[in-house]
Design a protein with these regions (language model features):
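Dynamic "connector" segments at or just before major functional cores
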Residues: 1-70, 76-79, 107, 119-187, ...
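Short, conserved catalytic/metal-binding motifs centered on acidic residues
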Residues: 73, 89-90, 107-119, 205-216, ...
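Basic, amphipathic alpha-helical segments enriched in Lys/Arg and hydrophobic/aromatic residues
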Residues: 430-499
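DNA-recognition alpha helix
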Residues: 85-104
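An internal, acidic/charged active-site-proximal segment
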Residues: 292-388, 424
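Long, low-complexity, polar/charged, intrinsically disordered or flexibly structured peripheral segments
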Residues: 219-220, 228-230, 234-244, 252, ...
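Polybasic low-complexity intrinsically disordered regions
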Residues: 91, 124-314, 318-331, 339-341
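Short amphipathic alpha-helical "interface-anchor" segments enriched in bulky aromatics
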Residues: 93-94, 353-377, 413-461
């Protein structure tokens, strides 16, 4: 039968009633580290989960578990014991009454392991747990050369980024249904929207975001089984398809651990203006995919799905320093802030005596870098002037111009979108904005280190997406708690009526 909606106020009353019953003057007591967990779930309203999943339940049959309580229990699992599995978590719900109460269950009346996985399937909403079919042709094993310390793998196909961007310019990109769309819609409406209203994402009319990829190891080696009996017949190397347990995964290079791994390449987009480094959009790619290739797909998908504001700037590291990426972001009306990946130490020559440094800064005939002097929007060009002038004063020993305000020079964005950025790399504004790029790295660190993302031991893209999104929900819950903890007095509220 259909689940009955339990409002967040009803959940809060249930928590008060159960804590007063079991933790007031009895054997069970609450310690100081319990209160942050209680407060985090107290401020998190996910009652709409029941409305979202109502269509997945039939009109007849036994009464189901409250979907909001199931999701709340999984979030509590990630907040307290993310390294264990669901089976052990059910044991924890029986062992610790507080966990059952905070989930929304009465102590002793706990859902089983199968009930949790049934809930995950309803939350997922698709028949397929992976993008690719499990039965595929046998993958060829190639001996891969180990890369140097800190070195990252390069794209397999040279020029692939430019080809993808040109294809997007030529044919466009219609919004297609992705396997993670249901989770993102829920995450955006129930978590991103709340954080936005609290002012935790930054200015929504001019939002800054940062993107970066990180390895997600799901297994050390690919696992597969034969679909034929050739081995029994003595045929060792047959070409029949094999059954892969993780068809969406492949092998890639982890530059931080300096080893090859099997799994995904998680590309994360986070808010660079958020003081809590809050994540916005995750995308799982094959492990062999390069950051620049992942960005092309992730940025287009994010621009089609994010509806809470307008992205004005995108902060990326030097791995994304490709001319095609600048053109793509400019086409999406997003200003790129990308660190240069030095390809030469020589200056570029121009039609006059001015040269251009590898960083895109004009250099006068005296060998000094010029300073930015405003951007002309009408002609889409950046103005530069002599760095030794201040007003009408010029302290240069060999001035290269007799102009009253010193030598000036203009660079046009259309000439080289990579070198001549709208905001000059040498300006203080660039440095102030770009120093927030590491916010996405801190966000990834929280997911992988604090919440033990790779401890999932899952075998399907479905479960990895559910784990990732729920960890992102926990990151937002942590931020809400930090904003509201000074005004929360739960101890007085819960035990005020007990003597």
């Amino acid at each position: 039968m259909k689940p009955v909606l339990v409002t967040h106020e009803s959940y809060q009353n249930f928590v008060i009633e159960q804590l007063q019953k079991h933790y007031s003057g009895g054997i069970l007591t609450l310690v100081s580290k319990d209160w942050p967990i209680i407060a985090k779930l107290w401020v998190t309203d996910i009652s709409c989960t029941t409305t979202l999943l109502s269509d997945t339940y039939s009109l007849k049959g036994p009464a189901p578990r409250d979907p909001a309580s199931m999701l709340r229990s999984y979030l509590l699992f990630l907040l307290t014991n993310p390294t264990i599995g669901i089976t052990k978590w059910v044991d924890e719900l029986y062992r610790v009454p507080l966990y059952a109460i905070l989930s929304g269950f009465e102590p002793g009346d706990i859902p089983g392991v199968g009930t949790f996985y049934d809930f995950f399937q309803r939350l997922w909403g698709l028949d397929n747990a992976n993008v690719k079919p499990k039965i595929m042709r046998k993958r060829k094993k190639k001996k891969k050369k180990k890369l140097k310390k800190g070195e990252k793998q390069v794209p397999k196909s040279p020029g692939i980024v430019e080809k993808l961007v040109n294809r997007f310019f030529r044919y466009g990109s219609k919004k297609k249904l992705l396997i993670g769309d249901r989770l993102f819609d829920f995450f955006q409406s129930q978590f991103l929207d709340v954080s936005a209203k609290l002012g935790l994402l930054g200015h929504l009319n001019s939002l800054g975001v940062a993107g970066d990829g990180t390895p997600l190891e799901t297994a050390r080696y690919p696992r597969s089984k034969p679909t034929c009996d050739c081995s029994d017949k003595g045929i060792k190397q047959c070409k029949h398809p094999r059954l892969y347990s993780q068809p969406d995964c492949n092998s890639g290079w982890d530059s931080s651990r300096e080893r090859f791994f099997n799994g995904y390449h998680l590309y994360m987009i986070s808010s660079s203006d958020s003081k809590y480094d809050l994540p916005l959009y995750p995308r799982l790619h094959p492990a062999s995919r390069h950051d620049s290739v992942s960005l092309v797909a992730s940025s287009i998908e994010f621009s089609q799905r994010f509806t809470l504001g307008t992205v004005s700037k995108f902060l990326l590291d030097a791995a994304h320093d490709a001319e095609a990426i600048y053109k793509l972001l400019n086409h999406l009306e997003i200003e790129p802030f990308i660190d240069l990946n030095p390809r030469t130490k020589k200056n570029y020559s121009t039609e006059n005596d001015i040269q251009i440094s590898p960083k895109g800064i004009p250099i006068c005939s005296s060998g000094k870098e010029m300073k930015p002097n405003g951007y002309d929007i009408s002609q889409n060009r950046q103005k530069w002037r002599c760095s030794l002038t201040s007003g009408t004063k010029n302290i240069c020993n060999k001035p290269c111009s007799t102009a009253k305000y010193g030598r000036t020079f203009h660079t046009f964005l259309k000439d080289n979108v990579r070198l001549f950025t709208k905001t000059p790399r040498s300006s203080g504004k660039w440095k102030l904005i770009y120093k927030r790029r590491t916010s996405v790295e801190r966000s990834n660190k929280r997911e992988k280190i604090d919440y033990h993302l790779e401890a999932g031991r899952h075998r399907s893209t479905k479960m990895w997406y559910i784990r990732i999104y729920c960890i992102m929900m926990c990151q937002h819950i942590d931020a809400w708690y930090c904003e509201k903890k000074k005004t929360l007095k739960l101890s007085e509220l819960i035990f005020s009526k007990t003597a």
